[in-house]
C-alpha cells in the first residue's frame, strides 16, 4: 500500500486548522445563555491576534493560557547570555505585510534589522573552517530545489540528490528536521513545493528579541494566565470548557495550542474528534 504523507494544505482544509486553530462548533447556533461568545485557548501569536480581532468585532471573549506568560513559542530570555536571546520564534518573514514588523517599526523601543546573507556566516566542521570549495550551499540548493520541483505526493528521501555527499546529513537536519519538523521520509514534496513558491522577503530580526516584541504588541490583550484546559465538551448547543479553575460556557471555542499539545491528549474532547483529525495532529 502506498504510504500517505502529511500535507499542511490538506491538513488545514480537512481539519479546520488554520494557524493551528480549531473552532467548535462550526455550524451550531446557540440560544442558551452563555458566559462568552468565544473562548480562545492558547495565548501564542495566533490566539492573541484572534482575541484582539474578536474584541474589535464586538464579541465577548476570554483567552485562556496554561503558562505564566503570553507569546507561546515567541519568548525572549535576557538571563542566559545577559542579552536578549530568542528561545523560540526569532525572525519575521514577508516584511511588506507582516504586522509584527510594522509594529516594531512604529515603536521606538525596537530596532529591526535584515538577516545577513549566508556569505556573512562562518561555518565550521569541528575546528576546521568550511571554505567555499566545500560546496555546502550547492548541496543545500540542490536538495531544496529538487524537493520543491518534484510536485508529487511522495517523500523527499525518494528523490533528493547528494545522498552520498559528506554534507547530506547536515542538509537533512537543516531542510528536514529544522525547516519542516520532519525527516525526509515523513513529509510530502507536494507540501514543500507549496512553501517554496510563496514569495518571501529577506527575514527580519529584532535586536530586543522577537518574543519581547510580541509580548509588547499584545500587552493589553485580556488573558487568563495559569489556566489549564482539561476538557472541551462540544456535544450540545455551544461548548463547555473545563479548566483547573472551573468551567466556562461559550457559543464557540477557538483552539490555537500547538500540535504537540493536541497530540499529547492533555485536552480531552467530548465527543472525540474524528480519526482523520487525530491522525493529522501526529503527522503534521
What is the role of each PLM region?
Residues 2-284:
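FAD-dinucleotide binding site
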Amino acid at each position: 500500500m502506498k504510504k500517505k504523507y502529511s500535507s499542511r494544505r490538506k491538513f488545514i482544509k480537512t481539519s479546520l486548522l488554520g494557524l493551528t486553530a480549531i473552532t467548535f462548533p462550526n455550524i451550531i447556533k446557540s440560544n442558551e445563555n452563555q458566559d462568552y461568545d468565544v473562548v480562545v485557548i492558547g495565548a501564542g501569536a495566533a490566539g492573541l491576534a484572534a482575541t484582539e480581532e474578536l474584541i474589535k468585532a464586538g464579541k465577548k471573549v476570554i483567552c485562556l493560557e496554561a503558562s505564566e506568560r503570553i507569546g507561546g513559542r515567541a519568548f525572549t530570555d535576557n538571563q542566559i547570555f545577559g542579552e536578549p536571546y530568542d528561545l523560540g520564534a526569532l525572525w519575521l518573514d514577508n516584511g511588506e505585510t507582516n504586522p509584527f514588523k510594522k509594529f516594531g517599526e512604529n515603536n521606538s523601543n525596537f530596532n529591526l534589522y535584515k538577516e545577513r546573507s549566508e556569505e556573512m556566516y562562518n561555518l565550521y566542521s569541528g575546528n576546521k573552517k568550511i571554505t567555499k570549495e566545500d560546496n555546502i550551499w550547492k548541496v543545500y540548493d540542490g536538495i531544496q530545489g529538487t524537493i520543491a520541483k518534484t510536485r508529487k505526493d511522495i517523500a523527499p528521501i525518494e528523490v533528493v540528490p547528494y545522498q552520498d555527499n559528506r554534507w547530506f546529513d547536515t542538509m537533512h537536519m537543516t531542510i528536514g528536521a529544522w525547516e519542516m519538523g520532519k525527516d525526509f521520509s515523513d513529509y510530502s514534496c507536494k507540501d514543500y513545493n507549496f512553501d517554496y513558491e510563496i514569495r518571501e522577503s529577506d527575514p527580519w530580526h529584532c535586536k530586543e528579541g522577537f518574543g519581547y516584541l510580541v509580548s509588547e504588541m499584545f500587552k493589553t490583550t485580556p488573558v487568563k494566565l495559569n489556566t489549564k484546559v482539561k476538557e472541551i465538551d462540544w456535544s450540545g448547543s455551544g461548548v463547555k470548557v473545563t479548566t483547573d479553575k472551573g468551567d466556562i460556557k461559550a457559543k464557540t471555542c477557538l483552539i490555537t495550542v500547538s500540535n504537540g499539545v493536541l497530540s499529547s491528549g492533555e485536552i480531552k474532547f467530548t465527543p472525540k474528534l474524528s480519526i482523520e483529525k487525530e491522525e493529522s495532529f501526529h503527522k503534521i
